[in-house]
Amino acid sequence: GKWWEGSFKQGGFTHGMTRGFPERGGRHGDDGLKIGREGMEPIEKFVDHAIAEKKPFFLWYGVFLPHTPHNPPQRLLKKYKDQGHPISVAKYYACCEWFDETCGQLIKILEKRNLREDTLIVYVTDNGWIQNPKRNGYAPRSKQTPYEGGIRTPIMFSWPNGGLAPANRPELVSSIDLFPTVLAAAGARCPNGVPGVNLLENLQKKHPIKRQGIFGESFAHDIANLKKPEASLLFRWRIEGKW
């Protein structure tokens, strides 16, 4: 899927679709961007390979939906056009549903192989929609802003045999919490000094997550100075309490 770090091997992955060549289309993930839009076969092959090797697996499904290009199937586009939405909005909504369908296909791949109950699924996204359909730039209070549309997104965990009871948690968490939490679920040791909080026990026992606040930074889309990252800094923000 979407992968900005060059070859998948640079991220420690053994398998992947992204070549990372410095060529047209390589910025977001070249061949990896086909996943979801053109089927799920590479994922099926990878899961089957892990089964054949009798090894656990980590799968990154960074599907390039509902990101542009907004080219949903006509059956989905018609559904939202018929509701009276502007064409740009109808395309976006249709791509959201298309993405949702591929998530269902991914779950079916696990179910078909009797892996679903023992597989931890983590859903995370980066930012909300650029909400002004008439503008190609960044809409106020949306992507790349310190406001809710830019930084408040859902994180979901599902692990049927992992003791995670259904719950809607209001506490503050951050994507930096995913690494220590996933390591704990896998029974692996977390390196010292890693930022983030291991949420596994909180999720299993419904213990409150005691955190006063979370912090973050927002940077400009284009880097101003490779040797001075702070030159592109736009915002520093802190969230605390009920938000």
Where would I find each of the regions flagged by the language model?
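Loop/turn elements at helix/coil->beta-strand transitions in domains of secreted/extracellular proteins
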Residues: 53-59, 115-121, 153, 210-211, ...
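Beta-strand elements within well-structured catalytic alpha/beta cores of enzymes
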Residues: 57-62, 96-99, 103-106, 110, ...
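Active-site His/acidic residue clusters
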Residues: 43-92, 127-140
